[in-house]
Regions:
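Conserved small/polar residues in nucleotide/adenosyl-binding loops
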Residues: 1-5, 179-181
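A glycine-rich phosphate-binding loop feature that marks nucleotide/adenosyl-phosphate handling sites
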Residues: 25-31, 138-145
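Structured core elements
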Residues: 81, 116, 131, 162, ...
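Active-site neighborhood of thiol-dependent amide/isopeptide-bond enzymes
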Residues: 104-136, 141-143
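A structural-propensity feature for long, helix-poor, extended segments
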Residues: 140-176
Length: 181
């Protein structure tokens, strides 16, 4: 939050003498209690896709998307929006230019490859038997899952992948990205 203000001060205003920069401390209280989170004990669904043939920018976007969904706790009745969780698609949010599908064509865009994250999550959600509330396919077939097993997200068309925790316990979402060497 203050990163830009500190940078601007140090590069434009600081006279290289001792100084202090006041920072506001915000304490976030956890939403769930330890007892509630202790209910998260089982793997409900797990799915893996490979991106080992992807270029470095696309691979970085997949890894970034995984890190943005990782650690999410979804309580009973709550809806998860993949788009809201991984956006905005910007350099500041860790994204690079890479190929994405737009109207049946491959074009470079910030965050290209992010749909592999939403697709992998979609398949894990299906295996977990959670309630899918919104899902769109791509304009072309993707190579990392079987046809019709994809879940596209896109800012321009409003596509999102959403699901609801229809269980009686919290769900912990773990998103991992492993680099193949």
């Amino acid at each position: 939050m203050y990163k830009r203000q500190v940078y601007d001060y140090l590069t434009e205003e600081w006279n290289h003498e001792a100084c202090s920069i006041p920072l506001e401390i915000v304490v976030d209280e956890p939403k769930g209690s330890a007892e509630e989170l202790a209910q998260v004990t089982d793997v409900l669904g797990s799915f893996t896709t490979s991106y080992k043939t992807s270029g470095s920018s696309r691979s970085a976007n997949v890894a970034n998307g995984c890190s943005l969904i990782n650690g999410t706790t979804l309580y009973p009745g709550e809806e998860f929006s993949t788009y809201k969780t991984v956006s905005p698609f910007s350099v500041a949010n860790g994204y690079y230019m890479a190929g994405s599908y737009v109207s049946g064509k491959v074009v470079d865009s910030l965050g290209g490859g992010i749909c592999q994250v939403s697709t992998t999550l979609y398949n894990a959600v299906l295996l977990a038997e959670l309630e899918v509330t919104e899902r769109y396919n791509h304009s072309m077939i993707v190579g990392y899952v079987d046809p019709s097993a994809d879940a596209a997200i896109a800012e321009s068309s409003g596509k999102d992948f959403k699901f609801v925790n229809n269980t009686d316990a919290p769900i912990y979402i773990e998103g991992l990205s492993l680099i193949h060497i």
